[in-house]
């Protein structure tokens, strides 16, 4: 075989090799998704194919992700109403949101291991089943003396979330072409964001702030029944429709990943390799800072708005809706832009900086007593802060290829949950003592730190390198001047 062919067509991400920018990669073990694109012992490129069903899969995932994320914020956005109904304090209702964050931290590692061992379908089934179970537990909790039951339902849904958050990048890699992965990941994140948006909008409408507790219980029960019906329908769809992977892989990198024996994969070794990846660790920190700020703002939004605009529970929900809808637009635009430009670091840094500017403007305009100004500044904040989510996922996959997408996404989300809990508790205490401006400036300081760290991340796009070298190999393999023996 032509020696040029051997040299060019070997993408050994497991060896100590040079990355795009010359940095030495010290990955010395193979992982389950190790794409060693080695064409030494065959003369034809593996077949790749894109199936129309890929859009069904990502949209179905997006739908049950929506149903789960909606429940994350459904208590917090009408914080004052649930406080009165269940007879608990504000901090206790804040924990209905923070339980989503806390549950994620210890469970992400076993769930990531399960994803690598059992695949997408098993994870999807467990997520949809737990989400469905949690909604029906809540149906039974619509009485003032049953707060522990409603907390149990929320806890069950929070466990389901662990099986959801790390999936977008994995679904994108397994089902979509190399020019579609960022867009597909954005669609996966889109569902989560849309669920949060609906969680901001619908509860204040379905559960008005009425004085009669029996009437209030009836409104809460209707909200819980609607959620349970949707969750049950989606669970049935997942059972019937959701498929593990396409029969023929969508990319050469994915085809190479399938040739790696499962027995050669070590989850512990994969985690250790990721922890030695300096660029990825910096991204984990910056992602946690940004998304943690978003979690804190979302959880405490009702308190911020009610402090300056008493009686505006419905508009507090609409402002939250504005934040997330603007973010969904930002996510899709960023995903499409990444697929076309491949400028992962530059785009991530620009969006991070704009998130910081958006939060500063929001902080200083919140108390102007003009709600229309808050809607505009909140929309600008959401466009960039929520739009950052898929950027972090896709940048992580590039930096950590060929490691499992579920593992890298899981570590990002784990960081976000840790910072989310810390920021929510700290900002809440600062707001109680010094007001909303001080609380928001507290978050701005950490976004500034995150922006600086993002600028220090080295752009080592390993997945792009693997696909480029595989395509080069294909070109040489089909060249009429190629000599075969």
Swiss-Prot record:
Location(s) in or outside the cell: Cell membrane; Mitochondrion membrane; Endoplasmic reticulum membrane
Reactions mediated catalytically: choline(out) = choline(in); ethanolamine(in) = ethanolamine(out); heme b(in) = heme b(out)
Transmembrane segments: 47-71, 90-117, 120-139, 147-175, 181-206, 212-241, 278-308, 313-341, 344-366, 370-399, 408-433, 436-458
InterPro entries assigned to the protein according to its UniProt record, in alphabetical order: FLVCR1-2_SLC49-like, MFS, MFS_dom, MFS_trans_sf
One GO molecular-function entry: ethanolamine transmembrane transporter activity
Biological function: Choline uniporter that specifically mediates choline uptake at the blood-brain-barrier. Responsible for the majority of choline uptake across the blood-brain-barrier from the circulation into the brain. Choline, a nutrient critical for brain development, is a precursor of phosphatidylcholine, as well as betaine. Also mediates transport of ethanolamine. Choline and ethanolamine transport is not coupled with proton transport and is exclusively driven by the choline gradient across the plasma membrane. Also acts as a heme b transporter.
GO cellular component, one term: plasma membrane
Xref: SUPFAM superfamilies: MFS general substrate transporter
UniProt family annotation: Belongs to the major facilitator superfamily. Feline leukemia virus subgroup C receptor (TC 2.A.1.28.1) family.
Gene expressing this chain: flvcr2b
Membrane topology designation: Multi-pass membrane protein
Example GO biological process: transport across blood-brain barrier
Keyword Cytoplasm: no
Residues where choline binds: 68, 72, 161, 165, 295, 417
The protein, known as: Choline/ethanolamine transporter flvcr2b
PANTHER family: HEME TRANSPORTER FLVCR2 (PTHR10924:SF3), MAJOR FACILITATOR SUPERFAMILY PROTEIN-RELATED (PTHR10924)
Keywords: Cell membrane, Endoplasmic reticulum, Membrane, Mitochondrion, Transmembrane, Transmembrane helix, Transport
Cytoplasmic compartment segments: 1-46, 118-119, 176-180, 242-277, 342-343, 400-407, 459-485
Ranges in the topological domain labelled Extracellular: 72-89, 140-146, 207-211, 309-312, 367-369, 434-435
